[in-house]
């Protein structure tokens, strides 16, 4: 399977630069995966396509201010992106500029408050051992910036708009963007209608947004990301599967959690790291539906969606979305695949 099989034409002006004023007023393209039938709607009308008993599973991760700016001890500015926490003091990070970020280099972000030393090089970045005074999360909130994807050029006025309204557990370098469309009112309306909700956790890191560089996609190696599924969520998913009710993932991160822990059509409580790479031919055990945004050409996310709905159907839907000027990527419009 070739990387070019997942390419499509996207005019740059369709890449959404800012969130809409109201989260649930984004457009919704509904794709029926059996027939390829497409319906166009607005996200706040999601209820029309659900039935009482459907289980929506969301990712409760929260984006951290993962961009830090500092200087090397020897001089010269440096920027890092926190990607994965290794232990209490050590993080895997991306460093810019990378060519002078050698093992042993000391970095100063706020003198006496937050400093670090590069202690190792990894396949994708560096390991930094931080020294700090106080609580790391509080220091990060003071010094760090919310990381936005590189295709978003405009400054975000309200960082909360890059968080889902149910974000709880800090740890992500990027938002699980399918959830950005939900409002408290919409969730209440769906619950009143009989739709159930469950929460899992996946801290979004490089595994989600690392570009594919190999022409043969099977040679791509996913970066691992931390996940948790607790007992309550596992029980809700298993009950829905036993009773023949639909399990609908809100976002590709939820798909990867549920399918990582799937065993014979059931899930068990678990925590750990997943590097699950889902591409066409994958055997889905848990999910029956997917809410997701429109993804970058040649991305692992587009491959996952293609695995679930069929590559031709997905690329046809994308072509129609481009023609109808849907908004793409993180702050863009949504798809519901059922």
UniProtKB/Swiss-Prot annotation:
It is found in: Cytoplasm. It comes from the Bacteria. GO terms for molecular function: S-adenosylmethionine:tRNA ribosyltransferase-isomerase activity. Keywords: Cytoplasm, Queuosine biosynthesis, S-adenosyl-L-methionine, Transferase. It catalyses: 7-aminomethyl-7-carbaguanosine(34) in tRNA + S-adenosyl-L-methionine = epoxyqueuosine(34) in tRNA + adenine + L-methionine + 2 H(+). Pathway: tRNA modification; tRNA-queuosine biosynthesis. NCBIfam families: PRK00147.1 (NF001140), queA (TIGR00113). Transfers and isomerizes the ribose moiety from AdoMet to the 7-aminomethyl group of 7-deazaguanine (preQ1-tRNA) to give epoxyqueuosine (oQ-tRNA). Monomer. Belongs to the QueA family. This is S-adenosylmethionine:tRNA ribosyltransferase-isomerase.
